[in-house]
Amino acid sequence: MSLRFHEIAEARHRILNPFMHEQLMLLGEICSLTSTTCQLDLCCGKGEMLCVWSQRYGIQGVGVDISPVFLKAAHARAAELNCSDRVTFVEGNASTYAIEPGAFDIVSCIGATWIGGGLAGTLNKLKPGLRSRDSLLLVGEPYWIDEPSDDTVRATSGGNRAAFASLDGTRERIESAGLELIEMVLADHHGWDRYIASQWHTVSDWLRANPDSADADKLREWIVAGKREHLAHQRRHLGWGVFVARLI
């Protein structure tokens, strides 16, 4: 998986997950955000969550991402929404980022649990940053809608069936990490399509504009494989959601 390919394919995205703006704002309501809320968002992408929540609720936040392309967009978005004085973006590898213990009301990692080697490891990485038992941990994670075939497992999780769990299995993994699942906001087919299918158009336009690029052939292969994965497997068998938890 090439970060550059994602930077190209998601150039027109603000939210780098199968989540719609309305769902993002619903999640903010669920979290009871206020101007005193301080959030750490690992793998923040273009910073849309921090920026729109800061604009609406006045939260303060720190976003960490490895992509300078995404962070440039995050800084621009913060300036657009007049919240640059409340949100900070740090370029770095979220998997090795040193989280300040007990410093945050919300700690989040939305759709990037690879930073902890999977869901369990990511939850354990995030927990020390929580300020209190009332603080919230947000994690975005896929789940199996039904029992996947071997072909689906190969196409969507690199052949590792245990990479994801069922929806209830996801609850069990969260609880096994010493957390209580208290809410969730799930993606739907429309959200999946807007996230995935819109990348096809963006990449097609990029390939037309850059036919002689050294990346063209591999990017074309990557996006074609992604189409097959989404249409044959992911859209039907793989769900995605943001799960809201707190310490037991």
Residue ranges of model-derived segments:
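Conserved alpha-helix/loop element of class I SAM-dependent methyltransferases that forms part
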Residues: 17-35
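A short SAM/SAH-binding and catalytic strip from SAM-dependent methyltransferases
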Residues: 105-119
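Short alpha-helix
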Residues: 163-178
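A short glycine-rich, Lys/Arg-flanked "PGG" loop and its adjoining helix->strand segment in the class I
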Residues: 120-136
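A short acidic, Gly/Pro-enriched loop at the edge of an enzyme's catalytic core
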Residues: 96-107
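Short, glycine-/aromatic-enriched active-site segment of Class I SAM-dependent methyltransferases
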Residues: 142-161
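Conserved Class I S-adenosyl-L-methionine
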Residues: 185-248
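Class I SAM-dependent methyltransferase SAM/SAH-binding core
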Residues: 40, 48-96
